[in-house]
């Protein structure tokens, strides 16, 4: 095992790249053991373009399987190995947005028993023994039910993994640090202001339309400039979900809203002691302060 081990718990394929792709690539390139745990196949996602449009849930319902391939390619671009799905690929179904028919599906991730989900993540933590775990904030970044569920059960699992709870899930392992992945408001605004020409059909975001958190909430900033090419390639690998602009500095989801590809990724430390801080009072290393 590497002396630095990182586990990122995400809801759907592409989530790992959108907010943490640079961090994954940076630590993988630095020799850390980086694992991505994905909880659903993203079956309820919309699809960009006509080529794969009939894969959606209301037609062939084959999008989830297709997205396994996209995730596999994206993780390869980031240097993070093969995908890992909670309790196996397809065990839980993408819930879609709150109030939709998909959210009422008994197999939807949002309807799964939370204690069982917590136990499953505890088992992964005890197997992989990560020093650092990354997941979403309580709002799941933008309110998606699966993201909120991931936040809830991952937080519970990190707390339980080092205890005597869930004795059938392996030997206890204490996670040193837990982070939320977020986007700093001022960095997002600066990135939007730098957007130049965008592809036909795209538009700039309205003020406050893209999720972000106040600058004061951010505890940790990871410089990902050296691995932006890997992040761009990983974004492009999720071709049913993401389009990277020809400039390489913006991308859009199926809503055609231009979003900047930022040179830094942002986190909030919510468990464990902070490491060395810079002049702005922020960590620059997820593993800072951890004795190996």
From Swiss-Prot:
Keyword Metal-binding: yes
InterPro entries in the cross-refs: GlcNAc_PI_deacetylase-related, LmbE-like_dom_sf, Mycothiol_biosynthesis_MshB
Residues that bind Zn(2+): 12, 15, 147
Domain of life assignment: Bacteria
Enzyme category, top tier: hydrolase
MF annotations from Gene Ontology: N-acetylglucosaminylinositol deacetylase activity; zinc ion binding
Family: Belongs to the MshB deacetylase family.
GO biological process, one term: mycothiol biosynthetic process
Protein known as: 1D-myo-inositol 2-acetamido-2-deoxy-alpha-D-glucopyranoside deacetylase
């Amino acid at each position: 095992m590497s002396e630095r081990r990182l586990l990122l718990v995400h809801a759907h394929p592409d989530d790992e790249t959108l907010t943490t792709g640079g961090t994954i690539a940076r630590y993988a390139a630095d020799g850390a053991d980086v694992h991505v745990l994905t909880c659903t196949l993203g079956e309820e996602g919309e699809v960009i373009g006509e080529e794969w449009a009939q894969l959606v849930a209301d037609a062939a319902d084959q999008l989830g399987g297709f997205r396994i391939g996209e995730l596999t390619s994206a993780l390869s671009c980031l240097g993070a190995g093969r995908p890992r799905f909670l309790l196996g690929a397809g065990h839980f179904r993408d819930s879609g947005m709150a109030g939709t028919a998909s959210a009422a599906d008994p197999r939807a991730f949002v309807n799964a028993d939370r204690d069982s989900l917590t136990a499953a993540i505890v088992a992964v933590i005890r197997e992989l023994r990560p020093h650092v775990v990354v997941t979403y904030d309580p709002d799941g970044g933008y309110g998606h039910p699966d993201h909120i569920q991931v936040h809830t059960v991952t937080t519970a699992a990190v707390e339980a993994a080092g205890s005597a709870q869930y004795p059938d899930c392996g030997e206890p392992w204490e996670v040193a640090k837990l982070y939320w992945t977020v986007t700093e408001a001022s960095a997002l605004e600066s990135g939007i202001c730098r957007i130049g020409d965008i592809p036909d059909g795209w538009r700039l975001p309205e003020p406050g339309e893209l999720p972000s958190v106040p600058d004061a909430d951010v505890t940790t900033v990871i410089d990902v400039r050296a691995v932006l090419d890997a992040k761009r390639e990983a974004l492009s690998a999720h071709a049913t979900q993401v389009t990277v602009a020809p400039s390489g500095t913006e991308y859009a989801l199926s809503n055609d809203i231009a979003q900047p590809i930022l040179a830094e990724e942002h986190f909030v430390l919510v468990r464990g002691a902070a490491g060395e801080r810079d002049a702005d009072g922020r960590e620059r290393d997820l593993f800072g302060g951890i004795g190996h």
